[in-house]
Every structure is written in structure tokens, then in C-alpha cells.
Amino acid sequence: MTTLLNPYFGEFGGMYVPQILMPALNQLEEAFVSAQKDPEFQAQFADLLKNYAGRPTALTKCQNITAGTRTTLYLKREDLLHGGAHKTNQVLGQALLAKRMGKSEIIAETGAGQHGVASALASALLGLKCRIYMGAKDVERQSPNVFRMRLMGAEVIPVHSGSATLKDACNEALRDWSGSYETAHYMLGTAAGPHPYPTIVREFQRMIGEETKAQILDKEGRLPDAVIACVGGGSNAIGMFADFINDTSVGLIGVEPGGHGIETGEHGAPLKHGRVGIYFGMKAPMMQTADGQIEESYSISAGLDFPSVGPQHAYLNSIGRADYVSITDDEALEAFKTLCRHEGIIPALESSHALAHALKMMREQPEKEQLLVVNLSGRGDKDIFTVHDILKARGEI
């Protein structure tokens, strides 16, 4: 196997796919490498990010939730991006690559529906057909996003096999692509999967961290003590981390979904509580049974409900450059409510996991002077019905 770029991060990553898909992956890598060196492609991408998506996004200082502590907390506002989440960044890049390769169709998978919405809007903008695979359970719990996708002309295909969630949608999307790659581009939604996707997605998300670095230096005159992001597959987190990896004074903290609690087994934290295996075209930590079957992941947030994690996160964890922790459903929900009530911002449940860890750091050491940045990866409009039902069942509303 000869590739232009290194397909591994330490021992993690690779291209564990059927032989039939190798030409498609090689073509994609070649297109990406040439596009990265092409000023015209870069100018087109930058123009879409600025004038269509609305970059740069704001870096907002929290006014109220840090009261009584010595923490300064900023939110990187990816929730303000067109489409409602960080997902829009990299799909614009991938859609331009698809056009560059002469493809006419986009295949995508989605969990929370945010990547589906982003894929649909990019396809509509650039005149590409779009079909999106989504677990049947996620279709139910994310109905507003399903309608958004269909409004923009995408075909949404519910997947009923397995657990009817994101991992099953990924499997169906790959199956489709293996028979249609000559005309279709598979628009993978996270920094995981077979090479070159983890690298492509990181590079098409790295403006998150680049902007954050410039903005925090402008506002505070120094780098943050830590940047914090939620981790499912890990695209928003690697986008935030990438530009800080060589700044060793900056802590990188990834927050996995602890679900009902790690001890219950109902979580989505393979990085700290899984075992290394082969899944979704890559070698990475994953949740698996004693005999190596992929175990069901669980999270209150559909976008974190994924049984594996991107290979660069696995590598950063293995060398100790990044720390990975977990936050339960209940902790994320409390953070969601806190931001709504005290800052007037409705965060996605995914992003609420990262916020919850920042609040925990703040509460545990109120006397510690610390400068933290949370990547607020998406807005919570899609989650209000889920939160409403939980709060109603608890008698809180």
C-alpha cells in the first residue's frame, strides 16, 4: 500500500477497507494533496467559509457563570456558523473536492443530523445530489434536522439494522459507496474512518483552533491554560486541538460521553474504556465485547453516540499530549441548563459535555486562576424536544 501521506498516527489509523474501495481512497488522497497546494482551491474554500458560512466565529467571554471563581471562560462559537454547528466547515471543503474529482453525488451518514444538514446544504449550494444514511432511532429523535435535510433536497434513508444508530448508518453508507464510488463521493462526517479522512477532516476543521489562538491572544494577551472539546468521532476537538498541539503549555482536554455512568456500561467512551480493534476502516480504540464484537455505545446526545474514536485522538492520548475524561448525561444536562439560564445561549447536548467539564474544573478549584476555552461546537435547537421530555418526566417543568 503506497500513500502520499502517512496513513497512521502512531499505531492508529490505516486503510482497513475492501480492495474495491482502494482506488476511491487513493483518488481522494491525490485530490486533497493537490488541492492543498492549489491557491485557487484555497481561495474558493476561504470565500465560502467567510461569505457563506460566516467565519470567523466569535470567541465569547462568559459573563455570569464564572462568578465567585478566578476562572476566565471563553466559548468558541461554532454554534453561530451557518447550519448550526462546526460540521459546515469541513463539508464545504469535501464538497469542493468532490467537484474537483468530477463526482455528481454525495453519500453521507449522520447521527445528530448536523452532519446531514451540513452535507445537504453544501450539496444544494454546489449542485450535487445527496443521499444521507441515518439510524432509524436518530431519525425519530432528530426530526427537525431530518426535515431540514429534505427541504434542501437530500434523500434521507433510515437504517433499521443493528442498533439503528450512527454506527449502522456508517456501515450502510460505506456499503453504498463501494458500489457507486465512480460517480459518488463519500462525505465522512468526522475525523475517523480510513485514511485519508482523518487528515482531511482535521485540515478542513483546523481554522477553529487557528481563529481561537488569534482571538484569545488579542483578548487576553496569552494562550489559554486549556482548550476543551467534546469527543465522539472527534472532528470538532481535533479542529480545536490541531493548532495548539505544539504549544505544550496549553492543555488539550477531550470529553467523551459517560452516558448513564461508565460503571453501567451504557456510555460512549471507547478512548478511556475500550480496547483497540479494527472498525470503520481504521485501527482505533472501540467499545467491544470479550469476543471482539462491536458493543453498542450510548449517549443522551446522538452526535456522540459512536463506539469508536478518531485515530489522532487515540495517538494524542497514548503519548499523553491530550487528556480525555468523561461526562455523564446528567452532568451535560445541568451544563445545558446553566448556559441557557445564565448566559442566554442554548448549546448542543454534545457541546454541553465539554462545558460541563469546564464547570467542574472551575468548581473544584475556585481559587485557581485559569483561562479556559470551550469549543461550543453546535447550537441546541435540535435538542430542545429531548431536553423538554426529560425535564417534564422529572417534574422540573
Curated annotation (Swiss-Prot):
InterPro entries documented for this protein: Trp_synth_b_CS (IPR006653), Trp_synth_beta (IPR006654), Trp_synth_beta/beta-like (IPR023026), TrpB-like_PALP (IPR001926), TrpB-like_PALP_sf (IPR036052)
N6-(pyridoxal phosphate)lysine: modified positions: 87
Functional pathway: Amino-acid biosynthesis; L-tryptophan biosynthesis; L-tryptophan from chorismate: step 5/5
Highest taxon listed in the record's lineage: Bacteria
MF (Gene Ontology): identical protein binding; tryptophan synthase activity
Any single GO CC term annotated in Swiss-Prot or TrEMBL for this entry: cytoplasm
UniProt entry tagged with the keyword Ribosomal protein: no
EC number, UniProt record: 4.2.1.20
Presence of keyword Lyase: yes
Alphabetical GO biological process terms: L-tryptophan biosynthetic process
Cofactor: pyridoxal 5'-phosphate
Catalytic activities: (1S,2R)-1-C-(indol-3-yl)glycerol 3-phosphate + L-serine = D-glyceraldehyde 3-phosphate + L-tryptophan + H2O
Keywords noted in UniProt: Amino-acid biosynthesis, Aromatic amino acid biosynthesis, Lyase, Pyridoxal phosphate, Tryptophan biosynthesis
Family designation: Belongs to the TrpB family.
Quaternary structure (record): Tetramer of two alpha and two beta chains.
Purpose: The beta subunit is responsible for the synthesis of L-tryptophan from indole and L-serine.
Protein name: Tryptophan synthase beta chain
